[in-house]
Amino acid sequence: MPQLSRYSDEHVEQLLSELLSVLEKHKAPTDLSLMVLGNMVTNLINTSVAPAQRRAIANSFARALQSSISEDNAH
C-alpha cells in the first residue's frame, strides 16, 4: 500500500517481519493467517477509532488492500 506515511520504512518492515514470524512459528496456513489478521484489523478499528469514523476507515483500508493486490499468477 504505497503512500506517504509518518512512519519510517524501517519501522514498518520491522513490525511486518515480527508479525510474519509469529504466523510462521505457529505454522499458520494462509486462510488462518488471513482470518487472524482480519480479526486484528476489526479489533483495532472497533477499539481505537471513533464510532462515527469506523465505516470510513474500514472502507479506506479495503480500497487500499484491493489496490495493493497483484494480478500475476505467482504465489
Swiss-Prot record:
InterPro entries: UPF0352 (IPR009857), YejL_sf (IPR023202)
Protein name from the UniProt record: UPF0352 protein YejL
Classification via HAMAP family: UPF0352
The organism of origin for this protein: Salmonella newport (strain SL254)
Top-rank taxon, per record: Bacteria
Gene3D superfamilies: YejL-like
NCBIfam families linked to this entry: PRK13689.1
Pfam family, one: DUF1414
Family affiliation: Belongs to the UPF0352 family.
